[in-house]
């Protein structure tokens, strides 16, 4: 559905794209339970997950970002509790974040410890069930990021890792000059409104691989890499990856500077 949403946006189905909202309110508190909890190791949740989102925004915009501003940071939900057991396997508290028992863990096939070495691990960075309240984690858990592009398009990333398990936890909405589309990752459906509201349709994807990891995207990635290995030219390269990471750095800098707009090319303030 991501590919189809981009195709529709780029082929005039909703006119010229003007605004994009990528909403990612996901139940990914595992970022506080694995090695990701340390900014120095992972770059934080905005890097782990947000870099993919910035890739999507850049894909839709098809133009360089000239300004990134962000508000958010670390919520009070996971205020450190030095009295809590260090890891889930040592804890008998009632907790909605217990590793391997959350709805998202069960859905993604990790309703049990996949690697026994994680259970034996003593170092924090090697354990996969650290308590979400364990002191020492320094990553951000939410952000609202606004992006302005050279072609005039505006985009927003609405992001949190403490969202509930829900059908609409990740959506992409693109507003064009004559319509809009809204894609829902979980169902794979695209709600398309075109011709100034005179036409509306729901586009459904019956992908046989949707029951696999990342809703079939991992299998598609393997197939695509095989085509590249066979000689097909990739549509993107290193430059696109760097552009996404620059936006991550710009967003993180803006968070620390109270929402100051940052130029992702120079990482300097936009005046």
Feature names for model-found ranges:
Residues 1-130, 258:
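Predominantly a Rossmann-like dinucleotide-binding segment in NAD(P)-dependent oxidoreductases
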């Amino acid at each position: 559905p991501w590919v189809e949403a981009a195709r529709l946006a780029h082929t005039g189905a909703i006119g010229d794209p003007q605004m994009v909202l990528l909403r990612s309110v996901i139940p990914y508190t595992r970022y506080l339970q694995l090695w990701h909890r340390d900014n120095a190791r992972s770059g934080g949740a905005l890097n782990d997950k947000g870099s993919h989102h910035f890739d999507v925004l850049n894909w839709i915009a098809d133009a360089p970002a000239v300004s990134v501003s962000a508000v958010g940071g670390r919520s009070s939900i996971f205020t450190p509790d030095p009295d809590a057991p260090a890891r889930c396997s040592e804890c008998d508290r009632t907790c909605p974040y217990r590793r391997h028992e959350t709805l998202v863990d069960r859905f993604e096939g990790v309703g049990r410890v996949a690697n026994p070495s994680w259970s034996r691990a003593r170092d924090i960075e090697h354990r996969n069930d650290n308590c979400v309240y364990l002191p020492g984690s320094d990553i951000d858990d939410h952000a609202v990021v606004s992006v302005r592009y050279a072609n005039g398009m505006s985009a927003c990333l609405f992001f949190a890792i403490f969202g509930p398990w829900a059908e609409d936890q990740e959506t992409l909405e693109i507003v064009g000059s004559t319509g809009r589309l809204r894609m829902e990752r979980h169902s794979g459906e695209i709600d398309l409104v075109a011709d100034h509201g005179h036409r509306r349709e729901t586009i459904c994807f019956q992908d046989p691989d949707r029951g696999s990891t990342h809703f079939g995207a991992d299998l598609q990635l393997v197939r695509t890499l095989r085509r590249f290995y066979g000689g097909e030219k990739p549509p993107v390269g290193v430059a696109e990856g760097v552009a996404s990471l620059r936006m991550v750095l710009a967003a993180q800098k803006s968070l620390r500077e109270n929402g100051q707009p940052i130029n992702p090319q120079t990482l300097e303030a936009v005046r």
